[in-house]
Amino acid sequence: MAFGHRALHYVQHTLCYLPEPFGVALRAPARSRALRGCALQKKRGLALGLALCIAHCALCIDKEPVDYVNPLMGTMSSYELSAGNTYPAVAMPWGMNAWTPQTGKMGDGWTYTYTAHHLRGLKLTHQPSPWINDYGQLSIMPITGQPRFDQDERASWFSHKAEDARPYYYSVYLADHDVTAEVTPTERAAMMRFSFPQAAGHYVVIDPFDKGSQVTIDREQRRVTGYSTRNSGGVPEGFKLWFVIEFDQPLAYCATVSDCSIVPSCMEATASHAGAIVGFADNTRLVHARIAASFISPEQALLNLQELGSRTFDQVMSAGRDRWNDVLGRIEAQDDDRDHLRTFYSCLYRALLFPRSFYEIDPQGQVVHYSPYDGQVHEGYLFTDTGFWDTFRSLFPLLNLVYPDQSQKMLAGLANAYRESGFLPEWASPGHRDCMVGNNSAAVVADAIVNGIPVSDDDAATLWQALTHGAHAVHPTVRSTGRLGWQYYDSLGYVPCDVGINESAARTLEYAYDDWCIAQVGRTLGLPTSQWAAYERSAQNYRKLFDPTTRLMRGRKANGEWQTPFNPLKWGGDFTEGNAWHYTWSVFHDPQGLIELMGGNEAFCAMLDSVFALPPAFDASYYGGTVIHEIREMQIMGMGNYAHGNQPIQHMIYLYDYAGQPRKAQYWVHEVMRRLYQATPDGYCGDEDNGQTSAWYVFSALGFYPVCPGSGEYAIGSPLLRDVTLHLPGGRRVCIQASGDGPYVHSLTIDDQPHRSNFLTHRQLRTGCTLYYRLTPEPHAD
C-alpha cells in the first residue's frame, strides 16, 4: 500500500474517535455518495487558510459501515462477569476460519481478554463461546533473540494503544520482541505480515497445540504443514484441522518441537504437543506468511491457499474491507449520534460471524464439507458454531429478513446435518454438543420456511422428517439434542419436575412453542392437516404449568401436584439460567392466551411492570450457592429483576404491545439500548452469544422485533436511528425514518398511510416500503 493510501486509510479508520467539529459528517457510506466540499472559516492569512482547508476536507470523508465497528466490544469479560464474552474476530462474514490475538493460555476459553497485558500469538480459532471452547486451533507468534516455544516464554507485553482491531485486519506491536504483527483473512486463508527490528534473531513460532499434533518443514519450498487435533467435543474419531503456511523469505533456521523439546534441524515431528520454529536472516526486516486450513485434507488446505491468489497483503486487506462494507451495508444507517452508529454496526458485525461456514470448495469447484457428525466428506453446505437456544430468537430472523441468500444455504446445511447424524443440531460446535435445553431447531426452520426462504423439495421433506423425529426422540449420547423427557411430555403434556430431568419447566415451555413451530412448517409446506394438527394442539401445553395463584409458570410433579416450596426468584431448578419471573413469558406463540390466563391486559401489564419493580433478589441454591455470572449481571444492571444479559427474557419488553400498552415497550426498549449497550470493551450486559444479543439491538434500533419467530410478524418498538435503508434482494428497499425527540411513537405511517397496529408483517417488509416514525418525549395515549 502506498504511503498516501495508507495515510488516507488510517484517517478514515480513526475519524470516528475525533470530537466534533473535527469528526466526519455522519452520512451514507462513501460508495453511495460523492465526497462533499468543505467550507473554510474566515482566513487569517493564505497559509493558515490553506492548512485549514486541507485538514477539514480530509476529515469530511464519508465513513463506511466497517469504520464504525469495534471488534473489541465485549472483550472485557471474565468467568465471574461477562461484558459479552467475545474476542476480536478477524474474519470474513460467516467465514470458516477466524483469527484473534491470544492472551489466554492454551485451552483457556477466554482466549482474549481486554484487561490482559501479554500476547501469546495470533490464533486461528473456531470458538463460538468460552463455555463451549475451541477446536481447529493454531497459534503463530513472531519472536526475536533466541528460539523459544513455551507459551509463557514467547509471550510479549502489548498495549491497546499499539493495537488496531478491525473486522478484516488486526495489528499489534509486540514490545518484548520489537515486532509488529499483522493479519488479514479470507474465508479459509489469511496473510500475515511481520515487521522485524534490526536486532539479530528473527523467528516465527508455529504452535498447533497439544492433545495430538504434527508438523513438517519443507525448507526448499519455505513451507510448514501439519495438523491440530485439539478440540472440546463434538467431533468424530480422526478429526483434524490441516494447515499449510508458506513464507516469502528463505528459512535460515528450522526446528521442530516435540512435547516442549526444541530439536534444531529436525524437519518433522508428531507428538502430543508438536510445533515448529522457523527463522530468517538477520537482515530480514519484513516477512509475509500465507496460511490456509482445511478440515478435509492437507491437499484441500493447499487448495484453500489459492483464495489468496497472487495478491499482496494490502490487496487482501482491501478486499476484506470491501466485503465487510458490502455485507454491513445491506443496512445503511445514518444518525446524528456517532455512538449510535458505532454500537449499531459493532452489533451487526457480531451478528454476521455465526453460524460459521463449515464447507469448502473442491478442485472441481463443488461445495463439499467434512462432516463433524460422521467423519466423512459430503457434498453440499454445512454451518456450525451456534446454539439455537440463544439464536432462534432474533439472529436467524435477522438473517432471514436481510440476508436470505445466506439463510438459504443454512437451511440446506441443516438438512445435511440431519442426514449425517439422524438429528438436527441444537448446539453445534462443530458437531452435536450437550448444552442448553429445548428443541429450538424447529423455530429456526419455521422462521425460514414461513418467511419464504427457498428450499428444495428434497430438503423440505428431509427437514419435515427431522422435525417430527426430533420431537419424539432424544440423541443417544447428547441429551440436549432432540427432546429429553419427550415420553413424559407426550403423555402428560409437560415434563415433570420429579423424574430426574432438570430444568423441566423450561423444557416444557420450549417444547410447546417448538410444537407450534412444527405445525407452522407443516401448514406452510402444504402438508395434510392430519400431519401437523396434533402439534398445534400440543402447543397449548404451556397452560399446564401456569399457576393461577401466583400468575407464574411453575414446576409440576408427575402426579399433577405443584413443586413445593416455590420461590419465584430461584434460578435454575425448574428453569434454565433464569427464574419463574423470566420464564413465564416464554409463550412466544400465544401471548393472548397468556394474557387471558393472567386476567386481562391490565393484570398482564402489571406483571410485566413487576419484573422491573422487583429488587434484583435471587436464590442461587441450585448452583450450590455459586452466583453464576448471569445472576450477577442481572443484579448490577439497575433494572430490577429484568435480566437482559441472558436470552429467555429478551423478548419480554415487546409483550406490552400485545396488551395495549406499547408506550411501555417503547420506553424500556430505549432504556435497554441506552444503558446496556455501548461500542466499548465492556459494551454488553452479559454473554453476546453468537449474534443473539447483538441482533436484539439491531432489530430494536430499527424499530421492530420478532417476538415469535415463525409467525411472520414483528412487534413495533421505537427506532433509535434517524434514517435507515434495508437493501433487500431484487433491489427492494425498506426505508425507516424517524423524527422528533424521545422514545415514544406519536405516529407511524407506512408508505404515507397511517399505521395503527402494534405489529408489522414480514410480507410488508420484504416487498419494500417506507416507515416514518414521529417520536415525542411524552407518551401518546395507547
Description of each model-found segment:
Residues G4-C16, A28-G45:
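N-terminal polybasic/positive-inside topogenic patches
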Residues V24:
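Surface-exposed, charge/polar-rich loops and edge strands
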Residues I61-F396, N400-A443, I449-L509, C517, ...:
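Accessory carbohydrate-recognition regions in carbohydrate-active enzymes
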